[in-house]
Amino acid sequence: MSNENRTCSFCGKSKSHVKHLIEGENAFICDECVSNCIEILHEDGNDGTPSESAGGEPEESGKLPTPAEIVANLNDHVIGQEQAKKALAVSVYNHYKRLRHPKARANVELSKSNILLIGPTGSGKTLLAQSLARKLDVPFVMADATTLTEAGYVGEDVEQIITKLLGKCDFDVEKAQRGIVYIDEIDKISRKSDNPSITRDVSGEGVQQALLKLIEGTVASVPPQGGRKHPNQEFINVDTTNILFICGGAFAGLEKVIRQRTEKGGIGFGASVHSKDENADITKLFGIVEPEDLIKFGLIPELIGRLPVIATLEELDEDALINILTEPKNALVKQYQALFGMENVELEFEEGALRSIARQAMERKTGARGLRSIVERCLLDTMYRLPDLQGLKKVVVGKAVIEEGREPELVFES
């Protein structure tokens, strides 16, 4: 073949249209295609000379935040729950430290520190997991255990969790394999009884078994983008061994199981006297939970064994809810003040109003999750009229607005 007729085997450009044409044994490549290849390798985080460890895994770069730094970051987003924050921070730090030092794992087998969060609705379980993933800059996905089914049943099978995780990082398998999965409502798939003679919730136990494989580490085959619409596409294999799983649930009724184990006396003069403060009582009981209590509640022993770190969250009291309304970076009061500020209007919540909002959330048993709906309801009419209220300078929300449904006080320019 003459020099003039030679073309790049990749883009088809002739020698006269490129600066350089590199000749191989049976092919040619131009300088432009070489540059494109280098760019692709850099985008994948690989410069062509990967530093592989003894375990065949690439070393990760960047500073891993210490447990104290992780807790400090969580404090910006989540109020209270100090013990849960510490437990999470240490577990997450050890998990990612383990991934960054694969050579150490060649001599000692380090187990994964998956986490079980136990706490009432609205106590901050989901927010803790989300904030952790954001701080560590890793892919994060949340799944609802109640929507999961065994393979062969209508609904989501557990491997769809991994499909969602892949989607969060543009189907980058390496990133997904170091992500965090939060499974909410794990208590809702417990079997109905620990007695084998009583009919069990087979579907719930089946989901637990399926989750067990995923959590302990397996190679999940998931469909690529498009899934069933492109049946001829090859499946993507994702190793879940290094994915950190955090499971959470309210575990309503678990306190009765713990109480049965801990109480010595049953009736008469030897019977235990319970605290009038039921919430404080439950928080104390959750603090002494043992794996055997969770088995009796309905989780299978194998699953509990794969969730070695158990962190309990406290019921939020009135003061904690007020702090949630006002203190975090994304506090509700700050959010609404920013929205009103866009209309050049100042928004003020009086102390009595904040206490009433917190009290209503406690009465509804919704914790921090119920705060937004209460605030939204009391400000709805004002926000509807806000763009049309000429000369409005300030809106004041008092106690009567929350408790009696009155309109907030409107202060106009004089």
From Swiss-Prot:
SUPFAM superfamilies referenced in this protein's UniProt entry, alphabetically: Glucocorticoid receptor-like (DNA-binding domain), P-loop containing nucleoside triphosphate hydrolases
GO biological process assignments: cell division; proteolysis involved in protein catabolic process
PROSITE patterns assigned: CLPX_ZB
GO molecular function: ATP binding; ATP hydrolysis activity; ATP-dependent protein folding chaperone; protein dimerization activity; unfolded protein binding; zinc ion binding
Superkingdom per UniProt: Bacteria
Swiss-Prot/TrEMBL keywords: ATP-binding, Chaperone, Metal-binding, Nucleotide-binding, Zinc
Gene Ontology annotations for the cellular component aspect, listed alphabetically: HslUV protease complex
Keyword Chaperone (UniProt): yes
Matches recorded under InterPro entries: AAA+_ATPase, ATP-dep_Clp_protease_ClpX, ATPase_AAA_core, Clp_ATPase_C, Clp_protease_ATP-bd_su_ClpX, ClpX_bact, P-loop_NTPase, Znf_CppX_C4
Stretch list, region Disordered: 44-65
Domain ClpX-type ZB: 1-49
Residues that, per the record, bind Zn(2+): C8, C11, C30, C33
Pfam families: AAA_2, ClpB_D2-small, zf-C4_ClpX
Binding positions for ATP per the UniProt entry: P120, T121, G122, S123, G124, K125, T126, L127
Known function: ATP-dependent specificity component of the Clp protease. It directs the protease to specific substrates. Can perform chaperone functions in the absence of ClpP.
PANTHER family in the record: ATP-DEPENDENT CLP PROTEASE ATP-BINDING SUBUNIT CLPX-LIKE, MITOCHONDRIAL, ATP-DEPENDENT CLP PROTEASE ATP-BINDING SUBUNIT CLPX-LIKE, MITOCHONDRIAL-RELATED
Annotated family: Belongs to the ClpX chaperone family.
Quaternary context: Component of the ClpX-ClpP complex. Forms a hexameric ring that, in the presence of ATP, binds to fourteen ClpP subunits assembled into a disk-like structure with a central cavity, resembling the structure of eukaryotic proteasomes.
Name of the protein described by the UniProt record: ATP-dependent Clp protease ATP-binding subunit ClpX
Gene name as annotated: clpX
